[in-house]
Amino acid sequence: EGYGAITSLLNDNLKQLAEGSLFYTENGNMWVMMLFLGLIILVKVLATSATNGGGGVGGTFAPSLYVGCFAGFFFAYVLNHTGLLPMELSDKNFALMGMAGVMAAVMHAPLMAIFLTTELTGGYDLFLPLMITSTVAYATIKVFEPHSIYTMRLAKKGELLTHHKDKAVLTLLKMDSVIEK
């Protein structure tokens, strides 16, 4: 279950997450943990993409939270344990920002990502970093993919109704009704 894994990461309990897997070691080797986190992110993205792309119902909300949480945690974990920065980053804060960033990008809903993550934390301490992360993620994805995951299939079929009345009417118009025989 993904929510248990998210809870483990947010409580900074990486060992509990790795227990029972091939990657569990008593001493908690950081390179093994980095590999473990990286593989989880990669496999989850591939599994969700294959399921949704194949017509199955793999969901979008929970996988977005899961991948975002793991990606943010992975980013902070790598920087903390490789000595690339002179200071220690908060794994929990980066996990939360990763959740907000991926959710804002996948669903094209930066405000929802900001407020939902703020509700999860129970405070407004991370409000500005969440705003920056969600805005950058949304602006970046908007350049590459103009439609959210929910409207993408309709747009590809040409059945997406927009807020522009003229475009919506032209979308609904059938050629058989326009051409005289």
Regions found by a protein language model. Name each.
Residues 1-176:
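Alpha-helical transmembrane segments and immediately membrane-proximal extracytoplasmic
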